[in-house]
Amino acid sequence: MKVTLTAILTCAAVLVLHTTAAEELEESQLMEVGMPDTELAAVDEERLFECSVSCEIEKEGNKGCKKKKCKGGWKCKFNMCVKV
């Protein structure tokens, strides 16, 4: 009986700790409203630069825009990465 009770209490404690850790992780990953999107802006600028460079290189060779450079739901259009 003691073993079963100990096992149940241990399982409950682990479940509570796991749930608390998951909630803390989720809260830490949320963005606060009003905070600047500097990380996203940096990614967008990087994609724009990569796309422009790849398009300019291919333009000189009279080829179309290289769509492989823009990844993750983005495509290259008019020498810019645009969200699809």
UniProtKB/Swiss-Prot annotation:
Keywords for the protein's UniProt record, in alphabetical order: Disulfide bond, Neurotoxin, Postsynaptic neurotoxin, Secreted, Signal, Toxin
Localization (cell): Secreted
One Pfam family, short name: Toxin_20
Residue ranges annotated as propeptide in the record: 23-47
SUPFAM superfamilies given in the database record: omega toxin-like (SSF57059)
GO MF term (any one): toxin activity
Cystines in this chain: C51-C65, C55-C76, C70-C81
Gene Ontology CC: extracellular region; host cell postsynaptic membrane
Tissues showing expression: Expressed by the venom gland.
Annotated signal peptide: 1-22
Similarity comment text for this entry: Belongs to the neurotoxin 12 (Hwtx-2) family. 02 (Hwtx-2) subfamily.
Physiological role: Postsynaptic neurotoxin.
UniProt name for this protein: U4-theraphotoxin-Hhn1b
Species this chain originates from: Cyriopagopus hainanus
Highest classification ranks of the organism: Eukaryota, Metazoa, Ecdysozoa, Arthropoda, Chelicerata
